[in-house]
Amino acid sequence: NSEGLAEGIETRELPPYEDNPNIGDKGWRKLSLFNEKLADLEGTALFLDLDIVIRSDLTPFFEAEGEFLIVKDWDFPDDIIGNSSVFRFEVGKHPDVLENFYKLGNEIRHDYKNEQAFLSYEMDRKGILKYWSSDWCVSFKRNCLQPFPLNFFLMPKDPENAKIIVFHGRPTPEQAYKGFMGKGGLRYVKPTKWLDKYYQ
């Protein structure tokens, strides 16, 4: 749905995707980006989730060496799983990723927590899994929030060297800007007013 987008943003139809209601909504539709054809696009593509905040120029994300790069997931430091909020891939080069997803069918939910786990293991199997520099893409929850109880008194930190701030789960960027109280009251987020610098 392209309604409400700012003038000048070009859109394309989403690629075909065979929905499987038995595996739940874990972002699996992202895998449709690995169709052999992706609208009229070709070459290198950078995927960005909508619930991120861009702090600086994205050019380095296109200059980094590697065929497939993704954020190293903060929740799985001892696993190869990436966070698919920000990843780069070559359009049309990996249709087998989508094909393997379809082949697994309902079994996929037993072997993989979500789409980013499956994607990471597929790219590792192909020998091309690489991660962005850890200071490029940071987690708002892990890297910006003040530790308890300082979070009740101090605004979250603006990560000086980060290029992208990833908001996975709660709070969303909008919730963080206004202030947010998580379940149990411990994960309180003071209104994060410096976010407006990146929403010009």
Kindly give the residue locations of the regions a language model identified.
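Active-site-proximal specificity loops/subdomain of glycosyltransferases
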Residues: 1-42
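Conserved donor-nucleotide/metal-binding helix-loop-beta segment in metal-dependent transferases, i.e.
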Residues: 52-83
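Short, polar loop motifs at secondary-structure junctions
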Residues: 1-6, 54-59, 135-136, 170-171
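Short loop/helix-cap segments at secondary-structure boundaries that form the rim of catalytic
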Residues: 2-11, 59-64, 79-80, 176-178
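Catalytic metal- and UDP-sugar-binding loop of GT-A-like glycosyltransferases, i.e.
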Residues: 48
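Short glycine- and hydrophobic/aromatic-rich loop-to-beta-strand nucleating segment
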Residues: 85-92
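Catalytic core and acceptor-binding pocket of nucleotide-sugar-dependent glycosyltransferases
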Residues: 95-200
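Short aromatic/hydrophobic "clamp" motif used to bind/position activated sugar donors
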Residues: 45
